[in-house]
Amino acid sequence: MKKFITTAALSFMVMSASIAQTNWKLDGSHSKLGFSVTHMMVSETEGKFKVYEGTVASKTDMDFTDAKINFSADVNSINTEDEKRDGHLKSPDFFDAEKFPKISFVSKSMKPNAKLGKTAYTLTGDLTMHGVTKTVSFTAIGASQTVKDPYGNIKNGFKVFGTINRKDFGLSWNAALEAGGVAVSEAVKLDLNIELNKA
């Protein structure tokens, strides 16, 4: 009987360890969700979303293998430092913010990428934008360690980057140039700086 109880206790400890996780919340005041596109085939136009939120559940403070990530951004918060352009981006020509006010991302896997470093991962998940959901992959480079801020918050962070094709999500507006080519590139580069607070 004693052996059975000991075995059961050990099994419970192993199960508890396997389901233990560290929860994080995105710190919006110290993060940035940026993007850029090629304009007129000669320069980069940059923008960002100013309102967004997200949560992360990782195995430990530093192990984000197969972390569970949920993220959303408010399309109406788009900012390219030009009100007229921002208005056009919110219109049915692009995001159609009135009909599709949110962009969301839900992770499917997060695998270590040793070629890029000890804290590098390939992040794959479902990106939903303009009413279309596609599976996409990004590179995520984590901080080398956690830190505690002056207010007692435990922090970690990631730089996440990659490229998507806006036409895959139905954002197909463009204008042809006289010399050939188009006004706005189909490729959109994403560049996120993410700071997390341990929940």
Describe every region a protein language model picked out.
Residues 1-23:
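Bacterial Sec-dependent N-terminal signal peptides
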